[in-house]
UniProtKB/Swiss-Prot annotation:
It comes from Acinetobacter baumannii (strain ATCC 17978 / DSM 105126 / CIP 53.77 / LMG 1025 / NCDC KC755 / 5377). NCBIfam families: DTMP_kinase. Phosphorylation of dTMP to form dTDP in both de novo and salvage pathways of dTTP synthesis. Keywords: ATP-binding, Kinase, Nucleotide biosynthesis, Nucleotide-binding, Transferase. The keyword ATP-binding applies. The keyword Lipid metabolism does not apply. This is Thymidylate kinase.
């Protein structure tokens, strides 16, 4: 089983992933915990490039998208697909839905570009995607409490409003796969919401 976790900054994805990871391990299941961009040494190097705040050169939106898919291709081939073939459960902090929300809805890139990349480089989609939804201001306040903000976290509220709208669009198009969780609730309550879809 392949499960991805989506949402804007500071909505509690990491906490939920840890709880679900523990839940499956207590059932004696083998679980692979991973993230995007990242998940392999090479993909983590790309992640560092994507998140770094560079005051000397602005990264173009196309470059950002291509770097994310370079990391994703490596991640799929090296981690996700081998784990699924070994009947392990894969829990991924973000996957392709993040690219639609952040790069298409947030940055304004063409969906055709994303579709082309998905057709050529994404051979497997998650069976379940949890979208943790909370007001943008709440998530950003949580993100600021964690410390220094990365390149994405430094974006304006208007950007994250578009990102959230992107997630909402996907949820309405694919309600069978994408499950919206109310991330304004406590971590335990969010976990209980998620378990209902995994029963």
């Amino acid at each position: 089983m392949f499960i991805s976790f989506e949402g804007t900054e500071g909505v509690g994805k990491t906490t939920l992933i840890r709880k679900i990871h523990q839940h499956f391990e207590e059932q004696g299941k083998q679980v692979v915990l991973t993230r995007e961009p990242g998940g392999t040494p090479l993909a983590e190097q790309i992640r560092s490039m994507l998140l770094a705040v560079n005051h000397d050169e602005n990264m173009s939106h196309d470059t950002e998208l291509l770097l994310i898919y370079a990391a994703r291709a490596q991640h799929l081939q090296q981690v996700i697909l081998p784990a699924l073939e070994s009947n392990k459960i894969v829990l991924s902090d973000r996957f392709t839905d993040a690219s639609f929300a952040y790069q298409c809805s947030g940055r304004g890139l063409s969906q055709d570009k994303l579709q082309l990349l998905n057709q050529n480089f994404v051979s497997r989609m998650p069976e379940v995607t949890f979208w943790l939804d909370a007001p943008i201001e709440l998530g950003m306040n949580r993100a600021r409490e964690r410390g220094a903000l990365d390149r994405f976290e430094q974006e304006k509220l208007s950007f994250f409003t578009k990102v959230r709208e992107g997630y909402e669009t996907l949820w309405k198009v694919e309600p069978e796969r994408i499950k919206r969780l109310d991330a304004t609730q406590s971590p335990d309550q969010v976990f209980e919401q998620a378990l209902q879809y995994l029963a």
